[in-house]
Amino acid sequence: MRIWNRVAVAAAVAAGLAVVGGTAGAAPVPAAAPKGSCKLVTVREAGTVLGSPVGAGKQKTGSAGGVTGDRCVWSAKKKGTGGLKGKPLELEVVVESGSALAASYQREKAEDPLEADDVAGLGDEAFIKDLKLHVMVGERVLSVALHNYRYPKPLTEQQIQQKEEDAAKLAVGRLKPS
């Protein structure tokens, strides 16, 4: 599905919107933090996660339905790396904030509990649904997804989830104040 068409976590989690960032030693990060989703994962780190060199991340910001968001997408320089001819494997990181975000996150998770698997050790809580990872970090939701891949070959469901978790660990570490 296209990012701007999907409404995950009740118009929040994967709508392709908000970013929240923080720096070590800084005061707690407010719900609507400065822009910079592309700063949550470096180009080198994105390339490591995808297993292929990537270009600079492309950032988009916006807001809808009371949710503010920032999205960054890194694309493999070589097309076809995810198994789809002519398409670059992509890593997407989205950070969203808004007053109704926590309730929306919980609704999305509870909507189909058999399809949402909890993921331990990320943020305040995390789940993966439809091969998209969603992490609650304070009052923000970080979503990570790969795009333009084929599975089970060349990528298995476990490999996709691991790549998303690896990227989320990097991003969450940069979101949380120390």
Name each model-derived stretch.
Residues 45, 100-104, 159:
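Exposed alpha-helical structural elements
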Residues 38-53:
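Amphipathic alpha-helical segments
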Residues 26-33, 113-178:
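A short, solvent-exposed beta-edge/loop patch
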Residues 24, 56-59, 177-178:
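Short glycine-rich, low-complexity/disordered patches
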Residues 1-27:
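Secretory targeting and sorting signals
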Residues 30-41, 62:
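A metal-dependent hydrolase signature that marks the N-terminal structural subdomain at the beginning
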Residues 53-125:
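Short, solvent-exposed recognition patches
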